[in-house]
């Protein structure tokens, strides 16, 4: 932004030559700089904090003794994982006190490439939620599947100078960093040359490998699951982003590792969080509750949720209640439950008692619609011929993204093709970006499905169609339903569609209200377990969406076939 037109107004209001816009009285203000509570009037004007003084004002707000916090900041989130559009996501999190997020849109980038990134910038431009993008560093995520786009350093350079781009998204290709891969280092340099942050992703790295990763000026990691990992990264000067998502919930394990000495290198993030969890448990406000319940000082916790994130990602005018900073703030009842009562963004009331009170424009862009592009399929598309009855099977683990590499004697029909049964279900991945006709077919154990099929276009990271079923006819109906809806999640049985959740934005997001999406999702979960008999130990849709990610051991399936993560090579289903 250009500050000069604003400066006259700010100085005149602060000096008392002009009325301020708002004075907040009777608030207990959390001062994240001095780690104290300030009880004084707070003057606001031009969307900025002006100072702690009484003034002539156009409006006043009685905080009634509540605590006033800087607006909360999510240090790393994939908005697409909420299953709703950016505007609907903003409606969810603003009501919980989050006023800024660092969003890594690598899901939509894998489908739509630069057009998807431009959509995310355009769709968030006029929202009261401040959305900064971390440009995805790994599109495609691996060379073992067909994604919708390839983004090299030259492509990312077209957007890196945008003022709302915070830097480079999580560098998942840590082997490439350690090996000095030229394309990887080009992307890192692209951000560093502009003084922007490089986000990290280094699960399991330690010792010299971790030091090498940090030497590449990668600033953060949100993959810590132990206090030891957390402390090692902080000792190397990295920020640790403590994650509490829908699947990965690390806060309870990591919060005891926060100390007065290292707290300033901690940030809160959600990574992937579904709307039902935000509606029920909250967003970054939930991190505050967990942190305090595990002994973290409340003011320290607020600092982690605000100033630390702002400093980590270069948001120099946010993260604190101080003169000249953007007047994002939250009123909460206390510093234990953190019940959010009012939320202000740039000095304007945007949410009250859990409800957003301003219009949030949704952004329509044809470039991210109609993204299901498949070659016509027939009833032979999912046939799986096997030379013998012995087959490699993907074994599901309850409550885990890991799979087992199994060998099973499997049933076959008269033509030698696999027929689901004996607890075994057919799995297929259909390429949906360029109509290549690629269909990978495999077998899974532990899913429990009987009498139908489940399919989704949310399939990490390339987001092809993944479908599981115990008969080819219902699998075909499910894929055709996703083609009809432009993507989403569907359940089929007996040749008909039982339920669908359309996700027409890139096959990843709905533009319907989050409450509606959450209700439909809950109904579909019930159908999946009750009607299709999917195991209660399995989350039906998230499990499917990660069976296609060929970086998490042991066996995974892509549109190119069965992949053994242990050897990083394709293998055959038949043994």
UniProtKB/Swiss-Prot annotation:
Swiss-Prot/TrEMBL cofactor(s): Mn(2+)
Reactions this protein catalyses: adenine + H2O + H(+) = hypoxanthine + NH4(+)
Keywords, ordered alphabetically: Hydrolase, Manganese
Keyword Hydrolase assigned: yes
Coiled coil: none
Enzyme nomenclature, EC number: 3.5.4.2
GO biological process: adenine catabolic process
GO molecular function: adenine deaminase activity
Matching HAMAP family: Adenine_deamin (MF_01518)
Similarity comment: Belongs to the metallo-dependent hydrolases superfamily. Adenine deaminase family.
The protein's name in its UniProt record: Adenine deaminase
Organism: Nitratidesulfovibrio vulgaris (strain DP4) (Desulfovibrio vulgaris)
Upper classification of the organism: Bacteria, Pseudomonadati, Thermodesulfobacteriota, Desulfovibrionia, Desulfovibrionales
Recorded name of the encoding gene: ade
